[in-house]
Each structure stands twice: as structure tokens, then as C-alpha cells.
Amino acid sequence: MKERQRQWFIFVENRQAVIEALTRGECDGLLPAARSFLDGFAGFLLNHGIMAVFEAFPEQRARQSIPVVFFCGSLLYRPLFQLPSLQAVGDVLFRSPYILRQMGFNAVQIGQGFYRTNGRKPFDEEAVAEFFAPADADTFLAHQEQVLHQLYQEFPWLFRQGVWAMDSVSFSTPKGNHGLPEGRYKVCILGVCYQDTVLPLLWLFAPEEAHDLPLGQRLVERVEAALGQGVIKNLLVDRALLDGAWLTLLWHHGTHVTVSLRENMDVLSDMLGLARLGETEWMEVPPPDNHRDPAPQREITGFTDLTSWEACQAPLCGCLIRDHYPDHTEYQGVVMTAEAGDAKTIYERHTQRWDHEELLMSLTRYWHFDRLPPCRVGVAYALVHFALLAFTLLNLYQGEGDHTAIRNQGPPPLPLPEREIAVYAGPYFTLLRPSELMEIIFTYWDVWADHRDAILDALKRFEGSP
């Protein structure tokens, strides 16, 4: 027997229309109206103009009967509900009609014989896939630029933090049915350091074999074009983004870059030579958390006016890190494009880059952003795109009030049903308290008497009973 296909239909909130239907003995379904942190989060998105940005997502549909915001919202909430795939979105979608009310519409699963009328617009997980499948890396970059500009308007204090970090992470999709090949990709993420984590603000997708440097250069160019040169006051990058000419350009734009040196670089050799001079002073700092037993004794020393990196014409200050182990000593070098900078400042800036490493670990371990189902390229990009966006937006929401911290953790727990019931009638829904619903039924019992079994069935569905 062919498995029945699940479909979703869009509903508009209309309290008067639903109550009028109830007075006629008509009710198409009941769902629990869960309230939790997600309710406040929905209001946060609305109040800060994020939903308006979702409405502007670039699309290529010939028919546009379903609002764009519904496609974007579905994937934004997917990681918050810890749903592993689009099929799971179809199975669960939103448990809080309040959230959807904030967005201006609602949705409920259509069961066989559960709805009597036609004319509503079908929406299912396949529709989500078809919407995002044509999108490419530039589509998501353009959309996130719009989000970035909105965040800049709404949260100017975030950008005054001044310390940004950038790194890349790989993800993949397994081979699927009907000849769908596996996919291997990477995303270069540029974010701002905020409360012991990094909030992703702009990112660019690419095939896994793409080099990090052109991806990173393009991201910085887009931020400068959107927000102005110098908005990135301090940038922390990985060695994969080492390029003297680029660092010089950023210096002229007002951006100080901090980066680790490769072992074969002349500037590192110069710092090692200068460190042998008798007047060199070393400062002890806490040992690194590098899971080595015993942990090393770590010391740092600093240098200014470093000139042996010919490709970099920006002024350079350096920090040499020395780790003493029982049987050997290890060195590593870090430089910052600045006219002045002591070892402690450079070292502390360097250690902030590990916040970016923690971010990538959290997105993998707790948010499972890279645990993707077999899907087309555009869909894979969309799943990761909205997971990154959900992490940033939820952190900003949490920062506005006394909410449970989610930094470097998983999403908060799923909401549980509370006092209100989402009541559906025709193409409309509203939220009613149980007493309000029962009062209407008892008042108009003459029309409800013939629908006793239907209302009991609806209540059982509400309870989750078979």
C-alpha cells in the first residue's frame, strides 16, 4: 500500500471567522499552542525586521502563492527543533502556533478525512527542497548581506566590539536515491567575537577543494562594501589566509590583522634570533588547554618593527610563544599588523581565535549543522545557511534579556504545551483557552450534538491520543 503523502496548508489567523465557524458546529482541528523561549524569539525576529529580510530572499519561482518567509522560517526553526532533515520538518514543523501567528500565518498537518473543504494552498517538505534547490553560493551570500545590514542597524553595539574572526569548515552530504551524488563542500565563516563565542555574520559556500584565501578576501570585501572600510577594526585569521599583500591592503583600510606564522617564514626566524639576546624578557602565561600531559610551562615575549616579511608592507609587531615540556621546547609565532603592540595584547588577541574553533565545535557537536541528509547542492547550502543564522539570532535574542545561555551549547529544550489551543476552521486559525472553546460548544450544543464524535476525535488528536 502506497504510503500517504504528508501535506501542509497555510492558514491565516482570524479569530472572528473561527468563532463564527464554531457557532455553526464547524471545527477542522485542534493543536496544542506551546509557549517557550521560542515565543519570545518569534517576537524578537519580528521586532528587529528579520522577517522582512526573509521576505526579500532571492527566488526563481514562476508561481509565488506561498510566502517566501515560510520557506526561510521553516529552515530557521529546523535546528531549534533539532530536526535532522526536511522530512522531519514535514513530520514536526512548528509546535507553537503562537510563533506562526507572529509570522502572520499557520500550518497544520492534513490527515485523510481530517479536512472537509478544499482551496487551501498545499505546502510540504518537497516544496521547501524545490524552493532552495536552484539557489547557489551567491544567492545565500546576497541574502546574508541583507541580514548583515539589518543587524548593523539593529545592533550597532555588536559591531563596536571590533574583533572579528574568520575560518572555514567542511561538510558533506551522502549519496542519495535516483543517482543523487554525494556532495563535499566548505563554508568560510566571518563573525564577530561576542561573550566567549563568535557570532557568524557573513559566510560563503564553495566546493571542498576551494582555497580559503579567495573566499576570505571576498567576504571582507563584501563587508567593507556593505558597512564601510574600517568597520572590521581587528581581524583574527588562520594561517590558510596568510597573504602579505592582502594584510597590507587591510592595514590601509583600517583593519589590524592577527595571524599565526608558518614555521618556514623569515619573520619567525627573526623573532627566534632576537629572543636569544640577553635583554629579552619573558612573561609566563597560563598553560594551553592542549590535552597534553603534563601541560607545558608557557611564556611569551614581544617584538616591534619586524621587517623581514617582504610581502607585507604594513607595520608588524610579533609575539613569540615558548612552551617548555619535560624533554623539549616548542615555539610558535604570531604577528599583528600594528605600529605598536606588546606581547600580552597580541597573545590575548590570538587566543580569541579559539572562540571561533569553539563555535565550529559547537555547531558540529550540539547543533549538528553538518549532519545533512542526501540532497541537492542548493538544499545543502540552505540547511547550513539557516543553521548558522539561527545560532547568531538566538544568541542575540538571549543577550537582550535574562534567558538561558546557549553559547557553545545546543539549542534550548523544545517547548511544551501550555494553556491555549490552536483551533482551525476552514483556512483560518486562532488561539483559544480550553474554557473559551468549551463555553462556545455548550452554548451552541444544538449544532454540536450531531458532531460529538468529531469534537472528541479532535480533542484526542490534541492530546496525542490514538
What positions do the PLM features span?
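A short, flexible helix-boundary coil/loop motif
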Residues: 277-313, 365, 390-466
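Basic, short loop/linker segments at the boundary and entry of helix-turn-helix/winged-helix-like folds
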Residues: 28-73
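Active-site-proximal, Lys/Arg-enriched surface segment
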Residues: 121-195
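Short, conserved catalytic/metal-binding motifs centered on acidic residues
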Residues: 74, 89-90, 124-131, 160-171, ...
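Charged, often Cys/His-bearing segments associated with DNA-binding zinc-finger transcription factors
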Residues: 1-42
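An internal, acidic/charged active-site-proximal segment
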Residues: 203-320
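Short, positively charged, Gly/Tyr-enriched micro-motifs
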Residues: 63-143, 197, 250, 445
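Short amphipathic alpha-helical "interface-anchor" segments enriched in bulky aromatics
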Residues: 93, 280-290, 342-377
